[in-house]
């Protein structure tokens, strides 16, 4: 390409640039953090690729990041000799955003969040933060290994368009020049920039260089302004909590300190250091299938990759941090990581440490654990099914709300449940529903409330899947109160009385069955109900109504099954049927049971007509 070409930004990028320029102003200094981070990543990538291709690094110069200011021209230039980019990569990485990160970033900003600069790094759109302080940005880059001495120049004022042209470029790497706005001149001050680097980028292992002040002002000599050491390699006895908090924030772009951290150095058959953090807030993309991993893997302090599944199971995907080992080859691939003995050993030990730390938090700092559970409880429930080896440990960390709880807050443990079980109780009872309110108000609970039996109220979206695969806790099985018969609840006298009542209602049930033949499998007298006239149940091995709803919402095929209608023989509406079978009343009893399940009626208007008719 010989001539300069003008391109238009993707719509989302234009929106983002407008946001950067006009809204995100509370913490303007983060532009430098973002650009230095990009340069550091570029150097890490070159180090990694050069392990298998040493021709990529031209000469013997040290890989560094240089920051230069020109007060006369009002510019700041950040230069690295990292991997660089091709013209196609410049277009792809800067002109457009292929993933949905920007859209979600824009969508997530409400009035309170507009000034929250930390969201920038979380959504991977940091380059555009340049326009917070600059009214023009120029980027010149040349890909490492390119035989041509030509590079690509990208220029934009952030107003909808950008230009690309081919230019002479002797060195590989990337240089970003910011033309600083008139009212942002503070960032041309040498000490101001050094302070920002010290605050955000001190731990970056790539040396960050700035011109050293000389007495005569003529000699140009660069000095390293960051410590350029691996933070995690320091002795934890020399570190304060504030040091950990600052490192965590710079690593994750989180604006809140973590709940806790685990810093371990292991020496033996496998040598490694791990520094793992448990955040205080859930990330925005925790439920994204393709979310970026939170653990960074280093081999001999060289960044290798981020891969949560290789280093941490999915149910612990919220854990952030670094793992550095000398026992992996530097050219390890993502494929080799899977099943690698070193990685498997580190993973197993790391999981064990995290679970022990959570157990310790739950015991010694219950308030912190309550905060943790509010943010990550749903994810932890996945672990019961995914991590069979640690199932018992995870099960003890689970928290629930029950029919005896004062609120929807999940604070009850399975251990406490089992200890407080009634003498002849043989199961941990639970009910699943779409909402806490639906579970709390379910007619299925009536007999349990009457007999003072505790029931877990499950309304998280993972609960149905969890309990269906849970098995037992301390040899006690879990039992749904909406499935099958409730054996063991009735005394001998109650059983005998129920059998008598059932006989008395045989003819009523027979006539009801004819009316509801296409809608129910069976109708029977209930041992669950004390106040409500009716409810729906399913057989023990059939899919419950809540699971059916979940499957349908996911577009899955659901078996066509009919529920069982249970009626309360002591309710006035049901007693009426002994005198006269009223078809409208029978259908209303069924519709009421459907509604109490949280399911929409197929014909609500017809239901209203029947209700009005019965009232009149």
UniProtKB/Swiss-Prot annotation:
It is found in: Cytoplasm. The keyword Metal-binding does not apply. InterPro entries: HATPase_C_sf (IPR036890), Heat_shock_protein_90_CS (IPR019805), HSP90_C (IPR037196), Hsp90_fam (IPR001404), Hsp90_N (IPR020575), Ribosomal_Su5_D2-typ_SF (IPR020568). Molecular chaperone. Has ATPase activity. Belongs to the heat shock protein 90 family. CDD domains: HATPase_Hsp90-like (cd16927). PROSITE patterns: HSP90. Residues 550-616 are annotated as: C. Its main location: cytoplasm. The keyword Chaperone applies. It comes from Ruthia magnifica subsp. Calyptogena magnifica. Keywords: ATP-binding, Chaperone, Cytoplasm, Nucleotide-binding, Stress response. This is Chaperone protein HtpG. Homodimer. Residues 335-549 are annotated as: B. One of its GO terms (cellular component) is cytoplasm. Residues 1-334 are annotated as: A. GO terms for molecular function: ATP binding; ATP hydrolysis activity; ATP-dependent protein folding chaperone; unfolded protein binding. Disulfide bonds: none annotated. Pfam families: HATPase_c_3 (PF13589), HSP90 (PF00183).
